[in-house]
Amino acid sequence: MINLREITKTNLISIIDLDVNENQRDQVAPNAVSIAQGHYSNSAWFKGIFNNNLAVGFVMLDLIIKKNKCFLWRFMIDKKYQGKGYGKIALTQVIDYVKSFKVFTEIKTSYVPTDNSAEGFYKNFGFIKSKKVIKEFDLEDSGEIEMKYLLK
C-alpha cells in the first residue's frame, strides 16, 4: 500500500539512498539536497513515498498558503520502482492533501524538456502545459517548462 510519511532519523537514509535512472538525473535533485532545501524553507512540505515499509520515492511541495500558491517542487520514484503505478498513486495522495486546504485552485510544477522528461507522466495525469519558462530564483532562465493541474 502506497503512503506518504514524515522523514525521520529512522528512515532518512532509505530516502537519501533512492535514485533515478542515470538518464533522469538532470531532471530532479538528489533527495539529500531536496531535504536540506526543505528544512531551510518556510513553505516546504516534504514526505517519503513508501510501499508498505519500503521507501520508493520522495515528494516536496512549496505551499504558500497566504498567496494560494502550490508548486510541486520535487517528485521522484526510485529507478527500481518506476512503472509500477506508485507515482500515480502517490501523486493522487498529494493532490488530495493539497485539496484539503480548500484555498488552492491549481498545482504547478515544471520539467526539463529532454527526451526523458517527466512531461508525459504529468500530461497523462492531467497536467496542462503552459508556455511559461521557469526562472530559477527569478534570476536566470532554468529552461524548465511549467505545467499546471487544475483542482476541482
Residue ranges of predicted features:
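Conserved GNAT acetyl-CoA-binding A-motif
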Residues: 98-110
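Acetyl-CoA-dependent GNAT
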Residues: 2-73, 78-80, 91, 97, ...
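Conserved beta-strand segments that form the floor/walls of ligand-binding pockets within enzyme
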Residues: 71, 76, 108-110, 146
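Conserved active-site alpha-helix within GNAT-family acetyltransferase domains
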Residues: 88, 114-131
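Short glycine-rich hinge loops at helix-strand junctions in the catalytic core
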Residues: 85, 102-103, 126
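Conserved beta-strand-loop-alpha-helix junction that forms the acyl-donor binding cleft
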Residues: 108-119, 136-141
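Terminal substrate-recognition subdomain of acyl/acetyltransferases
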Residues: 141-152
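Active-site acidic-Proline motif in GNAT/NAT acetyltransferases
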Residues: 78-80, 84, 113-114
